[in-house]
Amino acid sequence: MATKIRLARAGAKKRPFYQVVVADERSRRDGRFIENMGTYDPTKNPAVFKLNEEKILAWLSKGAQPTDTVRQLLKKAGILDKATA
């Protein structure tokens, strides 16, 4: 089972809010997920990004691949550097 760390959309129309989740790559964007890692709210200025760093590092060590958007957010938070070190 290939796993991805990706964003699942929530919130109302025109007011997006995202959950950072670990999910099987075959499941739908907002469908079944394995574990919730945090939240991302792009509507705030600046955008609010909360993560459980320990869980993220654990899943990265297990081989979960972040999507491009999540990879950028992890770089901004400095978590991706810890995973590669």
Curated annotation (Swiss-Prot):
The keyword Ribonucleoprotein applies. The keyword Cell wall biogenesis/degradation does not apply. PROSITE patterns: RIBOSOMAL_S16 (PS00732). GO terms for biological process: translation. One of its GO terms (cellular component) is small ribosomal subunit. Keywords: Ribonucleoprotein, Ribosomal protein. GO terms for molecular function: structural constituent of ribosome. Belongs to the bacterial ribosomal protein bS16 family. This is Small ribosomal subunit protein bS16. It comes from Pelobacter propionicus (strain DSM 2379 / NBRC 103807 / OttBd1).
